[in-house]
Amino acid sequence: MAILMLSLQLILLLIPSISHEAHKTSLSSWKHDQDWANVSNMTFSNGKLRVKGIYYRNADICSRHRVTSAGLTLQDLQLWCNLRSVARGQIPSTL
């Protein structure tokens, strides 16, 4: 979920000051060489960012660390987020 929120914050930073009227952006992609997502079919209206056809229903956030290490640091922890995406009108499948 943190990755998704960070992505949305980056998208909002890339959109120049937008009034509360409906606008469409012409963003196509950013930082593709650093695994950032491509952006298409997006609208921003009344403070809401909408992406047609993709909705995130469930997110599982997990963490893992080495059991044998005595003094854990942040570098020893691993955090990942599993997102299940479904198109409009479909039932999400399990991971």
UniProtKB/Swiss-Prot annotation:
GO terms for cellular component: extracellular space. Its main location: secreted. InterPro entries: Tumour_necrosis_fac-like_dom (IPR008983). Disulfide bonds: none annotated. Glycans are attached at residues 38, 41. Residues 1-19 form the signal peptide. The keyword Signal applies. Keywords: Glycoprotein, Secreted, Signal. Gene3D superfamilies: 2.60.120.40. It is found in: Secreted. GO terms for molecular function: cytokine activity. One of its GO terms (biological process) is positive regulation of osteoclast differentiation. SUPFAM superfamilies: TNF-like (SSF49842). This is Putative uncharacterized protein UNQ5830/PRO19650/PRO19816.
